């Protein structure tokens, strides 16, 4: 396993550096590293490491969401108002509707199969979007109008909404009954996640105020509590649950609100941890990609993904109607909401594992969506934000 860790870090960082020199997103190099080192090409990664790949990816996601929370300006979101709430579910709903319209015609899927495919693809990738929005906030681009805060918060909640839809549609395919409670649980889990996160942040702020410990110990405490929140959500069997990832982000928000000095120092350490976490995250996402499936994908699947993204961008545009954003800022927000990676890698293979007839198609299109949209979306954000957004002086 030590050899695998060394290969992931050295090759991942090396390929990232090469891609950046070529003016391409570094994550493209990391994804390619994972694909080449993974079980479907050279098979150089230890099987035991791949068995815990999903846990390692979740740990990396927790680190960047915590970092996002520590720097998220809630007052900026309040100023935006209703569009901030709409961004959490309207773009994903539009993309799902696009799949329902296009997938039966292009791939011959039933409406329910198209809904399952749409719910797999409709989530934006926080692993791609969140670190870039954090960088924009640090550099001051678009912050006056709350643009990076809007995208960051929406991308985090969007995943919760889509995963609940995927679970519901998969249940219908298996013949299970669907209750109204499963849909009511979407807003409830988000709100509960916010409350639990803020409460935990407040408690930690009080603790750090009374007990003086090193910042390194503080971040270890934050990470441990974040892991416990995720485990608690995974083991909940009640009808009402909470979103652990939202709780993790709002843990950072709460600490920033009640103990800002400590939050700023911890945010710096989170940023340093993300250097290694990002490499593991995208290399391991790449390792899940079976390029053999791509040989079965025709032009129709590419057209389907592009068509669904047009629906998604239309959904973002609808959310932004009535805001004070200009055309360039709206276009940037629409582009920033397109990358796919983490959710698709996590749930893309589930329909096949459950024996659904559409399983092969869903996994193939999910793989293609990662390969196409993660690097292209990252490139669109990286190359346009200085041109499209205003820097706060």
Predicted feature descriptions by range:
Residues 1-393:
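Transmembrane helical cores of multi-pass secondary ion antiporters/exchangers
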């Amino acid at each position: 396993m030590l050899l695998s860790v060394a290969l992931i870090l050295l090759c991942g960082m090396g390929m990232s550096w090469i891609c950046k020199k070529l003016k391409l997103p570094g994550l493209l190099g990391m994804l390619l590293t994972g694909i080449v080192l993974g079980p479907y090409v050279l098979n150089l990664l230890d099987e035991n490491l791949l068995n815990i790949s999903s846990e390692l990816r979740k740990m990396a996601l927790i680190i960047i969401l915590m970092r996002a929370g520590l720097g998220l300006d809630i007052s900026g979101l309040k100023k935006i108002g209703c569009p901030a709430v709409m961004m959490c579910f309207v773009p994903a709903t539009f993309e799902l509707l696009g799949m329902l319209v296009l997938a039966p015609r292009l791939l011959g899927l039933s409406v329910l199969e198209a809904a399952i495919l749409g719910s797999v693809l409709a989530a934006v990738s926080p692993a791609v979007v969140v670190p870039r929005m954090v960088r924009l906030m640090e550099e001051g681009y678009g912050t006056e109008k709350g643009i990076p805060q809007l995208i960051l918060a929406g991308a985090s909640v969007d995943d919760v909404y889509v995963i609940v839809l995927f679970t519901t549609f998969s249940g219908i395919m298996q013949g299970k009954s669907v209750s109204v409670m499963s849909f009511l649980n979407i807003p409830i889990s988000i709100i509960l996640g916010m409350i639990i996160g803020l409460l935990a942040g407040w408690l930690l702020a009080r603790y750090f105020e009374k007990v003086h410990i090193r910042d390194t110990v503080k971040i270890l405490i934050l990470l441990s509590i974040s892991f416990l929140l995720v485990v608690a959500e995974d083991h909940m069997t009640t009808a009402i649950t909470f979103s652990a990832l939202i709780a993790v982000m709002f843990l950072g928000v709460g600490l920033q609100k009640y103990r800002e000095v400590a939050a700023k120092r911890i945010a710096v350490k989170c940023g340093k941890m993300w250097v290694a976490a990002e490499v593991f995250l995208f290399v391991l996402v790449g390792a899940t990609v079976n390029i053999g499936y791509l040989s079965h994908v025709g032009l129709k699947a590419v057209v389907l993904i592009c068509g669904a993204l047009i629906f998604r961008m239309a959904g973002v545009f609808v959310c932004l109607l009535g805001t004070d954003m200009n055309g360039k800022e709206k276009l940037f927000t629409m582009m920033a909401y397109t990358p796919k990676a983490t959710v698709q890698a996590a749930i893309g293979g589930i329909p096949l594992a459950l024996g659904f007839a559409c399983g092969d198609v869903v996994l193939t299109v999910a793989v293609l969506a990662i390969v196409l949209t993660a690097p292209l979306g990252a490139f669109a954000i990286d190359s346009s934000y200085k041109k499209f957004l205003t820097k706060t002086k």
